[in-house]
Amino acid sequence: MSDQETLIKNLSQTWPIPSKTSPIIIIGTGGIVKDAHLPAYKKAGFEVAGLYDVDKDKADLLAKEYEINTVFNSFEAAFANKDCVFDLALPPANLLEAVEKLPENIYAIFQKPLGRTLQEGNDIRKICHKK
């Protein structure tokens, strides 16, 4: 069997649920969050601790639909939490600002593309490595 065949045979498309999970705070409540992230987190049994969106009414509606108790009024209020995973579901034009405000030593999930340009993507990567 070739190396490539061995690699393909051993690829996994499913992974075990972690034994210890962290609450998730979602920044941005657009279609991908409503249609994919929240249903997936619910199915996996992951706790969504809160939502933030510049359109608070949209975040409030989604929180009610998914029984999420906290809707934050600002990035800063959401980012005051440190023992969680941040799901940044933002348009590329807003990602750099959010990443700059992230607390240090946390985990974050990013949507693609990672910035509007290669330079902006590299800037975001550098900020992440510093934090």
Which residues make up each language-model segment?
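Polar low-complexity intrinsically disordered regions
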Residues: 1-2, 130
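N-terminal Rossmann-like dinucleotide-binding module
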Residues: 2-66
